Structures are given as structure tokens and as C-alpha cells.
Amino acid sequence: MSRFFATGSDSESESSLSGDEILPKPVGGTFGKQPIILSDDEEDTKRVVRSAKDKRFEELTNLIKTIRNAMKIRDMTKCLEEFELLVKAFIKAKNIVDKEGVPRFYIRLLSDLDDYLNELWEDKEGKKKMNKNNAKALSTLRQKLRKYNRDFEASITAYKQNPEESADEDQEKDEDSEASSSSDDDSDEGMSASKFLKKAESAPPESRSKFLKKEEAEDEAESSEDEDWGSDSDESDSDESDDENKHASMASRFLKKTVTEGDRQAVEKKKEDKAKKKQHRKVKRKDEEGEEGEEDDNEGGGEWEKVKGGVPLVKEKPKMFAKGTEITPPIVVKKLNEILLARGKKGTDRAAQIELLQLLAGIAEENNLGQGIAVKIKFNIMASLYDYNTNLATYMKSDMWKKCLDCIHDLLDILFANSNMFIGEHIVEDSENLSNLEQPLRVRGCILTLIERMEEEFTKIMQNTDPHSQEYVDNLKDEARVCEVIERAQKYLQEKGSTEEICRVYLRRIMHTYYKFDYKAHQRQLSTEQESKSEQDQAENEAEDSAILMDRLCKYIYAKDRTDRIRTCAILCHIYHHALHNRWFQARDLMLMSHLQDNIQHADPPVQILYNRTMVQLGICAFRQGMIRDAHNALLDIQSSGRAKELLGQGLLMRTMQERNQEQEKIEKRRQIPFHMHINLELLECVYLVSAMLLEIPYMAAHEFDARRRMISKQFHHQLRVGERQPLLGPPESMREHVVAASKAMKMGDWKTCKNFIINEKMNGKVWDLFPEAERVRGMLVRKIQEESLRTYLFTYSSVYDSIRMGILGDMFQLEIPTVHSIISKMIINEELMASLDQPTQTVVMHGTEPSSLQNTALQLAEKLGNLVENNERIFDHKQGSYGGYFNRGDRGDRGDRDQKDQYQRKEGGYMRRGYRRDQQGQSNY
């Protein structure tokens, strides 16, 4: 390449052709003594030695900057991550902090972050809008920061009392550090931590609009470009000096350059002049913007208003009718049909359609077109609200739900106010009478269908709301309005509805009543004589008991309903309500007389879920009444399956795609019961395991040596085996561990230890306090544990005693003598205990006919040896094969046939005798 191109002063040409430059060879030099050639990059860059303090503080300031950015955008997850990194970085800088003290910018961040988190925590509306991850991160960060700030409490308090002093101290420190550092380092390196934080704090608030900010940024960019062009002469001078010194001696590169005081002052003066010019331009621009803003305010007459992009400030109402059009019922009906034509079509704005219908209803009301038109429009508004979500799984938003409730209330108000109006699905649109008041008004529609859809939407809202949030509680308050709507519809249909419609609305009322415990009725039952009769009468007149209401509604359905499904649901709800209020015998008799257990497998899944819930409630009721065996039998099917959560409609279990695809999973999710109707699964399992313990432990003691002993509860045995497999047993913690520990104590006849494991503070909080009459249930449990422990003790140690007094047994188990007498008498009658009662001495005399433990072991050994011999003979016969002849045609494995053949052979004395055959085989082996 020509050397002409290498002579230019342009920096770009120098960098591109630096590789082509020809350097003079040294005279007499060898290959090993070539001169050291430094690249331009190495020549330009300067080595900067930074102290450990600067490194650590820069790391802290970078993390603080990231945290403040995350605070601006409310990214709590990022805040939490960076705060944890900041704590680790502060620990790394501990040696420097011990020498220099805690930096003020660190204290400032802790204080600001604490105030920021407290402000967010108190903002309940803002917390609701947060997503799940941000809300969780906010809670975690708040706890960690409060714990972390305890070490810096004094410094934070001092900073909050006088933050200005802290800023002044920081400034003094920064000035000292600037004076101590070299001017070259100050010009090349970035800001320190305190400078950065000070700059961030002193920045003016964002009071101007985005457009003004953009203009300011453009002006700054232009000014910076002007400065760059202005400094071009300096750069060209430096380039020329570089070219002149290019071929100088290489040793001069490593010599220290002497900088005079005059050169340093000239550089500083030039910097100050540039800064003053820049500040002057900024002040001038601010003054111009202030004048423009005042002119705009004077013209507009007010402040700026923040608007959403693309949304007009004034929303014009759509014109329903042309100007001057006379509003009559036919015209309104025609316009209604025009609006409904777009319903269901692709691209239709459903929200706009609802607004049009509401606007049309307002126009009809303004022009007094009659209640018939209003009812017809409101029916269509309700239908449009229900059609707003095309997806079945999507639930109504809160604003739509409120519109729905208000519209139904308005509709019922109109129907109650106009007794001459008839509505029904059987009315054809051509035969409707919407405005002729001389005849009864007739409108096509079904109020019951709207109410059933409203109830379905309410269920979907509850299913899709987090049950542990305040939003769920707020939504649950709407159930009172839903029940009020159903009750009003019930009154209306009782007057004008058919029998089928009355049964349907009665079932809706039942479904909102059956699972609720009537505390007022319960208190009236437990009321003492301290209350006067007038007070009791007043309490009874306030509201109808739920038991009376359920009885009246269900009996009407039993008598009038023609569909099996409504009657089945009513029976199950009635049984559930009886069981919930401890009416065990009524609930049991109704279940047995209905024969639902015979054909419930043919019902649809929601009815099966209701049946499972009813059986569980029936079992819990039997347990509260002390009927342990009935409780165990009622809960056996649900608990033994291991799918109680799924069978009760309270959640889905993890399954593979082969067992359940996504579509089936969506369908099953729609069948789930809302959270406020759930049955406590831990209470259910505890009731089942305690019932199994009270039945299984005495049975195991009575049949300890029985090889063919059956299991009453497989799940209970599984829990016992799990407890036995543990190498080291500590104190019980979970509910299951408490029941297993109580079972082991009952095996030994130690009823007090068993009671302490079943009834304690932990179990009371988890299970027993959830019952309405908790004290009565605990008393029943203690009595049952005493009785079953007595039976277990007699089964286990009867072989030890010749006789024992009933008084001693009563003292051991703290039972009355008649109770002990009753228990022992039942055991003797059922032939469970081989003994007799001596009435005069109140003594139980053991017969001693039962084998001892040694004898039982010997019997078991003999039985196992007999089985072993029989198996060996069968295997031996199988290995020898079958011989021809009459005697070998049968099954040789059948012992009865073999015995018959052996007897025949012994009688006949033939060659097939077993002894002869064995002798022949023995000789052949030799």
C-alpha cells in the first residue's frame, strides 16, 4: 500500500493502517534483540490502581442503584434479590466498614427502603393489584429488612431526625476524598457512591410531561454535540504532537512526564468555562419553558389532565334514533331486534351491546312506554350479561356481577308491582302483549332460568377466587343477596308458577341452606330457664328455623316432583341437614328408606359428590353420638379409597395424562365445591382413625393367635405398620402419629396415656374444637376409651387371672361397677370371654379353658408343620409324574382323592401301594 495514505492526521486512517507502517530496522541488531513495540491501545490507556475501599463501595453503590430502580417500578422480586446481594456485599466489606464506619449512603438506603415498604404494606388497594410473586416478595423483604435494621437502629434514627446534616457530612467526606485523589483519576473514573446517591436525591421531581422531557433530552444531545465539535481543535493538536513524537526514542515512552502548575490551571479553567456555558443554556431553556407553560395555562384555564392513550376525553353516546323520531313501542322493539341480530356473531363487541341495551331501556323509561317493554329489554340485558364470557370456565368480573344482581332485583320489582303481567317460555313472540294495558301483559321469558344461571355464575366466582384472601370474604357476602333473590323468586312462583318451577326454585333454596349450621336454633335448644318465655317466643318469631324450612321444602318436592334428580338431591340435602344438627336417627332412617345406596352409581357426578358428602356427614354425626361402629361403616368407603378429596369435590389428585386428559380435568374442576362448603379432611380422617382404633384394638387382642384374623380397617393397619417401621420414635406431632401412639397405649390397657394422646391442646385445636358441642364429644371419647381399654385388658390378661373383683376393674379404669358389670356380661354372652360372674362377691371367675401363650405358640407351630408336610407331599407327587391306569386319572393334588386311592390300594394290596413304590424308588437310587 502507498505510504501516502499513512501521512494523514485522521485518527481513523491511522488505526486502519497501523499494521502497514514500516518501522526502521536497528543497525546491527539480531533477531533476539528486536525493539519493544507498543500498540496504540497500550499507549493511550493508563493503569489505574484502585483501593479496596473504592472497589467495595462501588459494588455497594451499583447494587443500591439497582434497588432504587426496582423501587421505582415496584418490582419487589428484583428488590428482594438485590437486597440479599447487597447484604452479602456489605459482609465482604466488613473490614473496611470497621475502619471507616458504616457509610451514610448505606444507612440512607436502609431508611428509604423501610419507609417505602411500610408505605406499600399500608396501601391495601395496591397490594390487591400485585401479582402473587410480588406480594410474596414484599412480605419476605419486609420481614428480612425489619430484622436486618435492628443492627443499624441508632444510625437510622439519627438519619431520620436530621437527614440534611447527613447529606452535608457526606459532601464533606466526598470533598476530602477528591482532594486526596489525583486529578487524573478524577477525570477518568466514574462517580463515587455518595455522589451518585446525592445526585439521585437532588434530581428535580418529574413535573413536566413526557414531550417536554423529550425536547430537553434532544437539546442536551445537541449541546453535547456542539461541545464535541468545539473540542476538535484540541484533538487535532494532540494528533499532530503524536505524529511528531512517533519516531522518537522508545525509551522516552517510559519516562515520567512533568506537568507544570500552569498547565493544570489551564485545564481546570477550560472545564469551568464549559460547565458555566452548559448551566447558562439550561437556565435559559427553563425560563423559556416556564413562559410557554404560563401561556398555555392562561389559554386553557387550568392544569394538565392525564389521559389514556387512544381514549377520547368525552365519550359520545351512540345515537339510537334519528332526530325527531317519535319513540313508540314498535320502534323500540324493532331497534331491540336490530341490536340482538348481532348477538353471537364473530367480532361483536359484547360490552358495547350491553351498553346499547341499557341505553335503550333508559329511553323506554323516559318515554313511559310501559313495563312490558322494560321487562323484555331487561330479559335481553340479562342474557347478554350471561353470554359475555364465551368460555364456560371464565367467571364474571365484579362490575358485571353487580350489574347482574341489580338487573334481577329491578326485574323482580317490576313483576311484583304488576300483577297483570304474565311471563313464561310457552309464550310465543308473536302473541306478546307489551303495551296494551286493556289486556294482561304477556312477555316471553323465564325468571327461573335467569336465577339458575345467576347461581351458577356465583359458584364460578367462588371457585376461581383464592379462598384465603379478603376478596373471597367480600364475594361471599354477596350470597345473602343471592339468597334474597331466590326467596323473592320463590314467592313469585308460588303465586304464578307451575309445580315443576316451584320444585326447581325450592331446590335452589335448599342448596343454599342444607350445609349451614343453624346456631340460633342450637342456642335456643341449649337455652336455660334463665331466659323468660317472652324472650324465647321473640327469638322464635325472628326467623324460621332451618329445620322447619328444610322439612317444608323437601316434603313438597317428595310429593310433587316428577323427576328423580330433584327428589334425590332434596333427600340427600335433607339427610345432610339432619346429620349436621345431630338428628342421627332421622337421618339414618331417611337414608335407609330412600334406598339411594342401591342405585347411586347410575346418577350424574354432581349428585354422586352430594351423596359422598352426605355419607361423610352421617358418619361424623354417628361419631358425635357415640355410635362408633356406625360411624366407621359410613366412612369406610370414602377413606379406604384414598381419594377422599376428589370424591368430596374438594380438589383434584395428581394423575397421568392416560388417566385424565386436559378436557376431563377442566370438566372436573367445574364440579368442585366452593371452599366455604368444604368438609375438613383432617377432621374426617381423625374421626375415621379413632373409630377404627376403638374397634380394631379390642378385636386384635381377642384374636391375637388367630391366623385367619380379618382386618376391620386396612388404612388403620397401614398407619400402625408405618409407626412400627420407624427406628426412633419421638413424641407424636401429626394427627396420625397421635392416633398410633394412643393405639399402642390401648393395647397395653393404659387408658390414661391413650386419652392424653387423643385429647390434648394440639388435637383440640386441630380437630375437637371444630365440633359445635366440643365438650360433649370429648366426654364421649373418654368414656369410650375407658370401656374399650377394659375389654382389651380382659382379652389380653384373662389367662393370668383365676378371678378378679369388678371393684378393682372399676378403680383401674375409673368406671362405675354397673358399667363394668354390663361390659363383662356382654363379653360372656357373646362368648368372647370364657368366665362367669359371682354375683354375691362381685367377682369375675375365669374358666381357664383358653390356651396360654405357650400353648398357642405350640399350636401354631404344629399347624405350620402340618401345612409344610402337605406341601412337600404335593410337590413330590408332582415331580414323579403320572402313571397310566385307573388310579392316576384324577387330580393328584387333591388330598381327598389321594386318601381314597390310598385306602383302596391298601385294601386291594396291589403293586401301586405307596410304601412299595417308595421302596422301589429307594433301591433304584442306589
Swiss-Prot record:
Residue span of region Disordered: 1-36, 158-309, 880-926
Keywords, sorted A to Z: Cytoplasm, Initiation factor, Protein biosynthesis
First-listed, main subcellular location of the protein, grouped into a coarse class: cytoplasm
PROSITE patterns the record matches: PCI
Chain intervals with Low complexity compositional bias: 8-21
Compartment(s) where it occurs, according to its Swiss-Prot or TrEMBL record: Cytoplasm
Domain of life of the organism encoding this protein: Eukaryota
KW Ligase (keyword) present: no
A GO biological-process term: translational initiation
Compositionally biased residues, Basic and acidic residues: 207-216, 258-275, 889-911
InterPro entries recorded: EIF3C, EIF3C_N_dom, PCI_dom, WH_DNA-bd_sf
Transmembrane segments: none
Biological function: Component of the eukaryotic translation initiation factor 3 (eIF-3) complex, which is involved in protein synthesis of a specialized repertoire of mRNAs and, together with other initiation factors, stimulates binding of mRNA and methionyl-tRNAi to the 40S ribosome. The eIF-3 complex specifically targets and initiates translation of a subset of mRNAs involved in cell proliferation.
Family of the protein in this entry: Belongs to the eIF-3 subunit C family.
Oligomeric form and interacting partners: Component of the eukaryotic translation initiation factor 3 (eIF-3) complex, which is composed of 13 subunits: eif3a, eif3b, eif3c, eif3d, eif3e, eif3f, eif3g, eif3h, eif3i, eif3j, eif3k, eif3l and eif3m.
Protein name: Eukaryotic translation initiation factor 3 subunit C
Organism field: Xenopus laevis (African clawed frog)
